[in-house]
Amino acid sequence: MARALHAGAISVADSLSGSRLDGGVTDQRPPFKFSALTRVWFSDTDAQGVVYYGRYLPYFDHARTEYHRHLGSLQIEGAEFVMRASNVEYHAPARFDDPLECFVRVSRIGRTSAAYDYATYRLPDQALMVTATQTVVLIDVATRRPRPIPDEVRALIRAFEGDDLAE
């Protein structure tokens, strides 16, 4: 039996069959305003039958990518974000075929860096699986040196995150 993700929203089964995998705006878990769905693949699990700790990083990457796709800031010409730091806390084990919803937000934006917060929940019981904070730095692809985040990208993030964004 499928259960709704959000009031009036599509079911978990419908969501994971394609229409919501790219992510979407949500008011389910403030201060998060965006989430992306995924499912635990067999290759994500370890010998204990649970998600191997390092496999959560691709879930965060998926959510972060879809967040920027939604904002229209997926690519910045001549620049790319690189990972500076990642801090992950594990709260409960996810298992093969569990549907997961990964919430993402930009919590801070600096001159050349941004901090992302994540919270991933198992569906449909809404059990918290993992939380994380990651810091990325924008670099020039030619020099591999940090460069300022463009004002247009900052404005898109600021408009979406509102007062929850630290600068």
Indicate residue ranges for each PLM-predicted region:
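Terminal targeting signals and extreme-terminal segments of soluble enzymes
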Residues: 3-101, 107-115, 119-167
